[in-house]
Amino acid sequence: LTCLNCPEVYCRRFQKCRNGEKICFKKFDQRNLLGKRYEIGCAATCPEAKPREIVQCCSTDKCNR
């Protein structure tokens, strides 16, 4: 699996996921709309959203755009 992996909105850096990591995810805080920082990468399971966070998970190559 290959996922995007960088904190910017318009990410172009990809990462080959390690064994056991079968999920691509994108996570961000919905309160900070102007200076939005993303956490994007690979995971074994979909990360749990904290209050006011949005988490999106998928399982195909480069799907976490």
Curated annotation (Swiss-Prot):
InterPro entries: Snake_3FTx, Snake_toxin-like_sf, Snake_toxin_con_site, Toxin_cobra-type. Expressed by the venom gland. GO terms for molecular function: toxin activity. Coiled coil: none annotated. The keyword Secreted applies. Keywords: Disulfide bond, Secreted, Toxin. PROSITE patterns: SNAKE_TOXIN. The keyword Secreted applies. It is found in: Secreted. Disulfide bonds join 3-24, 6-11, 17-42, 46-57, 58-63. It holds the Pfam family Toxin_cobra-type. It comes from the Eukaryota. GO terms for cellular component: extracellular region. Belongs to the three-finger toxin family. Ancestral subfamily. Orphan group II sub-subfamily. Binds with low affinity to muscular (alpha-1-beta-1-delta-epsilon/CHRNA1-CHRNB1-CHRND-CHRNE) and very low affinity to neuronal (alpha-7/CHRNA7) nicotinic acetylcholine receptor (nAChR). This is Weak neurotoxin 8. The lineage of its organism: Eukaryota, Metazoa, Chordata, Craniata, Vertebrata.
